């Protein structure tokens, strides 16, 4: 993926404001609520029976933070996203058998969460840069499947 200086600035500038714990928890909770079939990958998380249960679930919160912390590695390594996520791609494909479409869904939700939290900063240009980034991350995570 080729990045312009403006795209890099829009991504890193916004990322510096992100509360990884809060935005990560919200993004994963939204994924599990909006796309309930994704819950099957999180059976060990306990009660996911309602939106309230998902939002209040400490394991969802903790894993959301872990997911978004990992996403931060893409921000730090914009020019080497594929290699950055090689091991995670292998884990999600070979061991967890996650449908790669879920990576795209989570990326779409992350954009919604960022837009909600940073509406002034989330200009159409920022959205375009972030859309490019979440596509690149989803593609890198799905790489082992191809």
From Swiss-Prot:
SUPFAM superfamilies: Globin-like (SSF46458). CDD domains: Hb-beta-like (cd08925). Heme b binds at residues 63, 92. Keywords: Heme, Iron, Metal-binding, Oxygen transport, Transport. GO terms for molecular function: haptoglobin binding; heme binding; metal ion binding; organic acid binding; oxygen binding; oxygen carrier activity; peroxidase activity. The keyword Metal-binding applies. PANTHER family: HEMOGLOBIN FAMILY MEMBER (PTHR11442), HEMOGLOBIN SUBUNIT EPSILON (PTHR11442:SF7). Involved in oxygen transport from the lung to the various peripheral tissues. This is Hemoglobin subunit beta.
């Amino acid at each position: 993926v080729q990045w312009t200086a403006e795209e890099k600035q829009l991504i890193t500038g916004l990322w510096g404001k992100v509360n990884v714990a809060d935005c990560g928890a919200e993004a994963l909770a939204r994924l599990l609520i909006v796309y309930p079939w994704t819950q099957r990958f999180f059976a060990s998380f306990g009660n996911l029976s309602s939106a309230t249960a998902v939002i209040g679930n400490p394991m969802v919160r903790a894993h959301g933070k872990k997911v978004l912390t990992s996403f931060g590695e893409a921000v730090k390594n914009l020019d080497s996203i594929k290699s950055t996520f090689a091991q995670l791609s292998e884990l999600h494909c070979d061991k967890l058998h996650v449908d790669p479409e879920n990576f795209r869904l989570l990326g779409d939700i992350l954009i919604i969460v960022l837009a909600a939290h940073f509406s002034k900063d989330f200009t159409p240009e920022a959205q375009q840069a972030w859309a490019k980034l979440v596509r690149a991350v989803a593609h890198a995570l799905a790489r082992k499947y191809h």
